[in-house]
């Protein structure tokens, strides 16, 4: 006679939570892939829709702008909705946006599709971590959020280069169709695996958001986020044409380089988290300082394959290294100055990240049009120098607070 052990209630709950987190991670993977997929597809989109590479770059900058608006504004407007209902609507909008992109026959329609997708991105980034934290015990919340964000990391490493490969082999529309499939899988997974008894969000007024922006110390960090994170995107947005037209790599090789670049980003993100645990603002100063130097050096190494590749991978290593430190420092300042709106401060900083992407990619387009692709590197470096100066100022203010 065989025997078996009935799983405990706690074990069943843990299993359900893990499957729900997996569903959120799949959603994050799709959203992370669609955010940067255009970077690898710019040459294809430019050629097929008869627009310049600079104009094609608007698929990155306007997407980021849409996400920047979507994070604080749409999150505030939907705060009273059921979390699962909102999650399902986010995925519907995500699928529709990428579906329109997959059949777009004009650049205008493609831009509209990207903005629609971006709205879903902005809201998901704001509520995804909240849902992840709500479905696990309090002592496992950080791990749950990390699992959800694994989807973004995997998207950076594999989603973008694979999407670029699909676009090169079958056309750029096929890449967006693949993202639609991911969105449908995520929708089904969320509907089945994410519990329905989640608490509604706490309504956040625009007045509360304005209070945060009025706080000088927090506003300073939001600007640092936009400049320091966004500076790299002056170059990164046009990395594919830069690698092909300036460095001289074949399109197939660019896909592999994007994969290695994604791995460098993931490593840098983990390193940045550890470096920022003790003194985030000091760590950020050195991160931005080194990234600015790398961007300036790229101006001279980009025409050479070996030197250019080493510089570009170094750029990837530092590109997202600042993200954990910036988020942690915003939370520290919000807890100190506006303790009732810590979550809102984090959401606004997410908007600042996307605002930086929008600004950086837009400036990159202007530079590419007027000066040429290679000049995006030093211009991006100047943008990061702005973050270095403001970070030094913030360090001075921090020391003054400690003296008090």
Model regions and ranges:
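Extracytoplasmic
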Residues: 20-53, 58, 71, 235-240
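Helix-breaking motifs and short loop linkers at transmembrane-helix boundaries and internal kinks
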Residues: 50, 82, 103-109, 120, ...
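Conserved MFS/SLC helix-loop-helix module at the cytosolic interface between two early adjacent transmembrane helices
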Residues: 69-108
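Helix-to-loop junctions at the C-terminal end of transmembrane segments
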Residues: 71-83, 268-280, 368
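Paired small-residue
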Residues: 93-100, 108-117, 306-314
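Cytoplasmic helix-loop-helix junction between adjacent transmembrane helices
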Residues: 107, 113-151
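C-terminal membrane-cytosol helix-exit motif in multi-pass small-molecule transporters
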Residues: 180-199, 391-394
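A late C-terminal transmembrane helix in Major Facilitator Superfamily
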Residues: 333-371
